Amino acid sequence: MSEIVQALVIDIGSGVVKSGFAGDDAPRAVFPSIVGFPKHKGVMVGMGQKDAYVGDEAQTKRGILHIKYPIEHGIVNNWDDMEKIWHHTFYNELRVAPEEHPVLLTEAPLNPKANREKITQIMFETFNVPSFYISIQAVLSLYASGRTTGIVFDSGDGVSHVVPIYEGYSLPYAINRIDLAGRDLTDYLQLILTESGNSFTTTAEREIVRDIKEKLCYVSLNYEEDMRNTEHLASITKTYEMPDGQVISIGNERFRAPELLFQPKLRGLELKGIHQNIYDSIMKCDVDIRKELYGNIVLSGGTTMYPGLAERILNEIKALAPPVIKIGVVAPPERKYSVWIGGSILASLSTFQQMWVSKAEYQEHGPSIVHRKCF
């Protein structure tokens, strides 16, 4: 493989696709992982109506489209739509010919074996890639933080995972998947804003709620006290200007929405909070590596971007862990894209070049080769 050909790194999440070139320090293209189909054929006569729209274009036209999310909770559920997203990524966003570049894809922890094989098959047979690799998202985030051992809390739009990793290998028996992530926090914020007299019902308004969440929400270090403390309310209240110029004020909703991560019961969800999930995952690991995991709790993904989250996790884990244990929570500033960045680092290492699954290996062994080479 000549040095000049850059590998492509594609991290497709339940909410957002991050894609670009290995060796770059940030993804080149970031767009929503959605596919939209026109509700009525021929509504846009003379506009060159397409059969399907992907990403930002689907987002802007969503009023006249049926929107589909091909990835739910981190796992592909519709292969035809998924193929459209890959096609769009290669040809429209990155503007590359996939048959000319090695491709590194990411996958959710505990991704079913059949899914890995299907992805491998599509890459080699539909897109004709010369070589391919698939890597677990949380492991890439850990690499991006400069570690090979630690426990990653990775939370995106559709799913969260707690993944303990020892010397570069994830420990599947101790992974916790939590079906609570960014989309649920947006829903919850929409609910509590509606309770305080604002109306957000359309999909466009839902995007506004997501924007409010990303710009104004934070994690409280003492939720019960902050809920009781009415004097403190004036100091935390912020205003938000809607697209139509109307200004709304947001008070304790700012910290009530992300609190769901620690207290899913606030929405009647029978799930454990993220701190409990991190602790449980560490306790499933061998006693000899726990100390190292406690000291290297690494945050990753867009839903870990709230101010106060790292400190709150630290406090909650301190309360659960043995008192002598030193706890470290690492929140890299670029963690929104750390899975992609880890992939970019990995795919450009000279030592990694022998790891790729080549087209010849695929032709000889079929899709199951992926389990032998990517783990």
Curated annotation (Swiss-Prot):
SUPFAM superfamilies: Actin-like ATPase domain. Coiled coil: none annotated. Its main location: cytoplasm. Its EC number is 3.6.4.-. It catalyses: ATP + H2O = ADP + phosphate + H(+). InterPro entries: Actin, Actin/actin-like_CS, Actin_CS, ATPase_NBD. It is an enzyme of class 3 (hydrolase). It is found in: Cytoplasm, Cytoskeleton. GO terms for molecular function: ATP binding; hydrolase activity. Belongs to the actin family. PANTHER family: ACTIN. This is Actin. It comes from Encephalitozoon cuniculi (strain GB-M1) (Microsporidian parasite).
